[in-house]
From Swiss-Prot:
Protein family (similarity comment): Belongs to the SdhE FAD assembly factor family.
Family annotation (InterPro entries): SDH, SDH_sf, SdhE_FAD_assembly_factor
Cell compartment(s), UniProt: Cytoplasm
Pfam families: Sdh5
Record-level GO BP terms: succinate metabolic process
A GO cellular-component term linked to this record: cytoplasm
UniProt cross-references to Gene3D superfamilies, sorted A to Z: Flavinator of succinate dehydrogenase (1.10.150.250)
Role according to the record: An FAD assembly protein, which accelerates covalent attachment of the cofactor into other proteins. Plays an essential role in the assembly of succinate dehydrogenase (SDH, respiratory complex II), an enzyme complex that is a component of both the tricarboxylic acid cycle and the electron transport chain, and which couples the oxidation of succinate to fumarate with the reduction of ubiquinone (coenzyme Q) to ubiquinol. Required for flavinylation (covalent attachment of FAD) of the flavoprotein subunit SdhA of SDH and other flavinylated proteins as well.
Keyword Magnesium: no
Keywords: Chaperone, Cytoplasm
Keyword Glycosyltransferase found: no
Protein name, per record: FAD assembly factor SdhE
Organism, as annotated: Methylococcus capsulatus (strain ATCC 33009 / NCIMB 11132 / Bath)
Length: 83
């Protein structure tokens, strides 16, 4: 399985909303991301669904600055996709 395929598989969560947001990132911004952002994305995927949802909706802010920045980037991507 390719790295992209593995990531998309890891993006399959218990919530369709999370699936869509995470896949949007993999299909777009992930390819241009630097190594540290890619590592942060993989750490983000390690979060439980409820914690990930709170981070991506802005209800919680991760202590890890890289995860907080990535969550903000994902929120911005969703905003751009909605326009």
């Amino acid at each position: 399985m390719s790295q992209r395929g593995r990531l998309l598989w890891s993006c399959r969560r218990g919530m369709a909303e999370l699936d869509r947001v995470l896949a949007l990132y993999v299909h777009g911004a992930y390819q241009e991301a630097d190594v540290s952002e890619r590592q942060a994305f993989e750490r983000l995927l390690d979060l439980q669904d409820a914690d990930l949802w709170r981070c991506l909706t802005g209800l919680a802010r991760p202590e890890d600055p890289a995860l907080a920045a990535l969550a903000a980037k994902l929120r911005a991507l969703v905003g751009q996709a909605a326009c």
